[in-house]
A protein has these predicted regions:
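C-terminal soluble domains/tails of integral membrane proteins
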Residues: 261-423
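Short beta-strand and strand-turn-strand segments in soluble, beta-rich domains
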Residues: 53-54, 99-116, 338-355
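N-terminal edge beta-strand
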Residues: 42-71, 284-293
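Membrane-proximal low-complexity regions enriched in glycine and acidic/polar residues
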Residues: 64-157
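Bacterial N-terminal signal peptides
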Residues: 19-28
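Short, aromatic-rich amphipathic segments at membrane interfaces
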Residues: 161-196
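Internal/C-terminal transmembrane anchor helices
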Residues: 233-263
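Juxtamembrane interface at the cytosolic side of transmembrane helices
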Residues: 202-244
Length: 423
């Protein structure tokens, strides 16, 4: 009797403990706030540094109201350092990366061509792009432009916060149909969508309840285990199954015919890729400069990339190195950029670039220059992971500037030796 009493108390204590754990879990879940993170940081450093280089990005507006249009423009360079682990962008799609449908994408243009579908871009070429958006859902949203590459997935570019004011209920997305009528596709056909979802949910629930009320999983397992698998489904149940299949087929066929009759003029979803996208001329690697990467190191504790170059100025004006751009980050030489640059702060190191010789490279002159790129953003944006890549290589674009205002972007890439001890 004492054993029984202790067993009962143990069971009651276990139940109470389980109840306390469940209540504590519920309380912690109630205290959870919305998630807020930059997902591009999770991508490998080599993927972001050696695939694409985004520059001259501009967000036309960062404060808009619902239904207001805004755009993202810029230039996209397909790096020659493209890694072998990822298929080259023979099939890719320019899109935006944003937390849900906070804005509607009205159009995308690459190389001056409207590109609503996938396209082919060439390695070593630079393309101008424009993405037109329409504010939809109020909030404070982080918006990227990104290129989705077959087998490589989405490769996001720099992001900017967009503040959308107003009421979501005021949003409209009017489209003119082939018959000349204009509809708001935000709400068009919503009643039919809800109706058909409800019909099939009810049908599915009825189907599940019918079979579960018969025997359930455990009962059917017992029948199979006892050697009665052939008797598990009765003739009546076979008839019910056949009639259910027939009813589903009839509903689909009949209402499909009704829909085709009501909407005779339709266009199928479009397929196919765009080719021969016009690339920009006189952009990356087109300047009067010969640049050779000699060697380099990456100091992990100091978040510092040190790269040595041999640079020859083949032009008629002196040139200065003003910027290093990689993975959306911009490291600036403060002696060249003397005023504030309009760019997202978390991606801008306005004093992140320094040179062993900051004097201009004269026409016809060859210089050995050590370029130091140092900033905490190497770590906060998780680019320090290049020290752990299988080939430990960096890539980016160096921007050279002349007194007349000319700018010459040049791709640089090469292996670096990681240093893990402070020097």
């Amino acid at each position: 009797m004492t054993t029984t009493m202790f067993s009962s108390l143990a069971r009651q204590g276990g139940r109470l403990w389980a109840l306390v754990l469940a209540a504590a879990l519920a309380l912690t879940m109630a205290a959870i706030g919305p998630a807020d993170a930059h997902g591009e940081k999770s991508q490998a450093a080599f993927l972001r540094m050696r695939t694409l280089n985004w520059y001259d990005l501009k967000w036309s507006k960062t404060n808009v109201t619902v239904n207001e249009e805004y755009e993202i423009t810029g230039k996209l360079y397909i790096m020659n350092a493209w890694p072998a682990a990822i298929e080259v962008p023979n099939q890719c799609f320019l899109n935006t990366g944003q937390p849900g449908a906070m804005a509607a994408r009205l159009g995308v243009w690459v190389g001056g061509q409207f590109t609503p579908r996938s396209m082919k871009l060439e390695v070593g070429k630079t393309y101008a792009f424009r993405v037109l958006l329409k504010a939809r859902r109020p909030g404070h949203w982080h918006t990227h432009v990104q290129l989705s590459v077959k087998t490589g997935g989405p490769i996001p570019g720099p992001g900017q916060y967009i503040d959308i004011k107003g009421n979501f209920s005021d949003y409209r997305d009017d489209v003119k149909l082939l018959n000349g009528t204009t509809v708001n596709i935000e709400t068009y056909g919503q009643a039919s969508i809800y109706l058909w979802h409800l019909v099939w949910i009810i049908a599915g629930i009825a189907w599940i309840l019918y079979w579960f009320n018969k025997r359930g999983f455990v009962g059917r397992f017992a029948w199979v285990a006892s050697g009665k698998a052939e008797e598990l489904i009765t003739p009546q149940e076979r008839i019910v199954g056949a009639l259910s299949l027939l009813a589903v087929l009839l509903v689909v066929i009949i209402f499909y015919a009704i829909t085709v009759s009501n909407y005779p003029n339709t266009i199928p979803l479009q397929a196919g890729d765009f080719h021969n996208i016009q690339a920009l001329e006189n952009e990356v690697n087109s300047g009067p400069i010969t640049i050779k990467y000699v060697n380099g190191t990456y100091k992990v504790p100091g978040r510092e990339l040190l790269a040595n170059f041999k640079i020859t100025n083949n032009g008629k004006e002196p040139l200065r190195i003003g910027e290093f751009s990689t993975a959306g980050l911009r490291f600036l030489n403060p002696d060249v950029f003397t005023s504030k640059v309009a760019y997202p702060d978390y991606l801008l190191a306005d004093r992140g670039l320094s040179l062993s010789d900051n004097s201009p490279i004269a026409p016809g002159e060859t210089k050995d220059i050590a370029v130091t790129v140092q900033d905490a953003r190497w770590d906060t944006e998780r680019l320090s992971g290049l020290a752990y890549d299988v080939d430990s290589s960096f890539a980016g674009v160096l921007f050279f500037f002349s007194p007349s205002g000319a700018r010459y972007p040049m791709e640089v890439t090469g292996p670096v030796i990681p240093t893990f001890m402070p020097v």
